[in-house]
Each structure stands twice: as structure tokens, then as C-alpha cells.
Amino acid sequence: MGRDNLIERLKREAEEQYRIFNQKFVLTNRNVMLGVKVPKMRSIAREIAAGDWEGFLAGYGFGVGNAVQMAEIAEQLNRDERCRTIFFEEVMIIGMVIDLINVPPSVRLALVEQFVPLIDNWAVCDVFCGGAKWVGEPGRGPKACNRVPLEQVWEFLQRYLFPDVEECHPQVESSGTGHRREYGGENPQGCSEFEIRFGVVMLMSYFLVPEYIGKVFEVLARVRKGDYYVDMAVAWCLATARAKFDAQTQAFVAGAGLPAGVLKKYEQKVRDSLIMRKRGSSR
């Protein structure tokens, strides 16, 4: 599916009232929103992932193929410049396709690395992270064998969790480059706010397990805070951890010296979670 065909289809699926409603909650300064609901975007993404997904991603400047090579920095920036003009729904579908395709771990992580700079809002971030079912230990079956092990994903995420720390940007097999990327302010809210959120939401989605919970707390204590969408992600992650590791989470929060704003958001999310549980148990 080429871009022109995709846009034509998205416009057919768009709902003006939904666009007006959604724009109140999803702030994206880079991309215009058409108003297509997520289930319809997922349906389109599945069609693309089952067909010529390489041609689709290449049309947006992604380096794809059997041996994925990251674009040079200048080419990467040119791609990001082009992608400033695409619709919000296009970015969503690009992320969904990357989540859905069945590719080796090195190819997957190289595509993710190229995708993350396009994230400039919580919706794209959270939908992409929630759909990353490729995270996990390899298992049986043609798709399970291409999962990316937790340890490999953990190391990969460090560059996003700590974008200002040089040692968190190692040369890795997945990207084929040792360059630390400089985005020149492509993200209107700051080039690292949504990179950090991406890292935190990935931790929340896949690393709240006994083997990693201690390391997750260490990261949440160190990660740079102060940006609204980072603080919200940290609070969300802690509230989710509270439901799984109650005593450990409470002990961490009590001694971590978290900013007052993060604590307030965390406490609100815990209260909201308790309310929802009570409602569910009363049905």
C-alpha cells in the first residue's frame, strides 16, 4: 500500500466528531489529525504487515531489508523533516506495522530505533509500546522465535531512558551505527521528553516482573523528571507496579525522594485503580 492509497483510505475512515474530540486529549504539534479510530488503524496496519511492509516503510524513509542499515545522520534528519508533514494516523500505522511484522530481533530493533524520533505525543507512544508483543523470551512457533529477549530490550532502552548519558548510546548490532543521534529539536516538546516516556512505558509494559522489578525502581529513581509526559509515565509505572509488588513499591516510593508532582500523580492513579477494582468487584 503506497502513501497516496493509505491517505485516501484514512480520509474515508475519518470521523470529524472523533477528530474534534481526540484533538482535545492528544496534543501533536507535528502532525495533522484526520480522526480515524484506533481499531480501524489496526486493521489497516495488519493488511500492510501481511503484504509489502518493506515497501511501505521504505516510502517513509526507513532503512529496511534483510540487512537493515540505519540511514546516515543527515538522511535520518531529512526523513524526520519529511515525516513532520505526515498525518498523525500515518505515524500510528507505521508504529503498528513495526510491531506486527515477523522479523529477526536485529531488524526489529533497527526499525524501532528509526521510529522513536517520530513520537511526539502520548498516544503514539503508548499504542506502540502496548503493541510490542515481540518483547519476551523466544518460544515455539514461527513468530515466537523472533521475539527480542528481555535482556536485549533492556539494554536497548537505556539510550532512551538516559538520553544525556553517553555510555547509554553504545554501538549495537541492531542499529549498525555507533553514532549518537542529534535531532535538532524535531520534537516540539523537547527532543528527549517522549524518548524517555517511551522507555518508561516499555518498562511498565514488559519489565514489572520479579527478575527486573528492582532494576526498574533504580531506573525510575534516576530518570530525568520535570517534563509532564515523563512524570505521568513514571507515576503510571509506579501505580501499575503497586498492583503487582505492593510492599516493594510502597517502600521504594517512601524512600526515593520523588518530586512532589510525580508523587501526586502516582497517588491519584493508585486511587483511580482502587476505585475501578471496587466497581469491578461489585458487578
Regions found by a protein language model. Give the residues of each.
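Alpha-helical scaffold domains
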Residues: M1-E167, E173, H179-R283
